Amino acid sequence: MKLGFISDIHIDRSKTLQETDFLHTLSAYINDQALDEVFIGGDISNHYEKTIAFVEKLQAQSGAKIYFIPGNHDYWEAKSAKKHTLTIHDTFKSHPQSMLNKALIVGNDTAVVGHTGWYNHAYHDPAFTKEKLETGRHKLVT
């Protein structure tokens, strides 16, 4: 079994490349290398719905099994949106391609375990109160 790992592709940050460019390039590479499974280690995009759509399209286009572990950017959404980060986290946890808090046995002696490894240092900010913790919002990052 051939595995691939990549991270921080930020498909929506380029001034010249579109999402389709990333899909085409990654699919071609996956096929050229005959990869069976690919793990994307976060920061796919700056919006959770775009991240999910991208991994679904990449799996369909490449034919390989695509898994992802969301990074801090993947948890974002439009500033005007009111969805709580915990709701986005639950969306990721329930997605079949997400490795969030899951383990996958690969071959006979390897396991891949998904964890964001991300910690919000704003929790140590004195302005971060128990009330803000309960609302799930602090400076648009929790």
Give, region by region, the residue ranges found by the protein language model.
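Beta-strand-turn-beta hairpins that frame and shape the catalytic cleft
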Residues: 1-4, 103-114, 135
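N-terminal active-site segment of His-dependent metallophosphoesterases
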Residues: 1-65, 75-83
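Short amphipathic alpha-helices and their capping/turn segments at secondary-structure boundaries
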Residues: 26-31, 55-57, 95-108
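Proline-centered loop/turn at the N-terminus of a beta-strand
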Residues: 37, 65-67, 97-98, 111
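Short catalytic/ligand-binding loop motif for oxyanion handling, primarily in non-cytosolic enzymes
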Residues: 47, 76-78, 107, 112, ...
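Glycine/small-residue-rich loop that forms an oxyanion/phosphate-binding "nest" at active or ligand-binding sites
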Residues: 78-101
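Active-site-proximal loop/helix segment associated with metal-binding centers of metalloenzymes
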Residues: 113-142
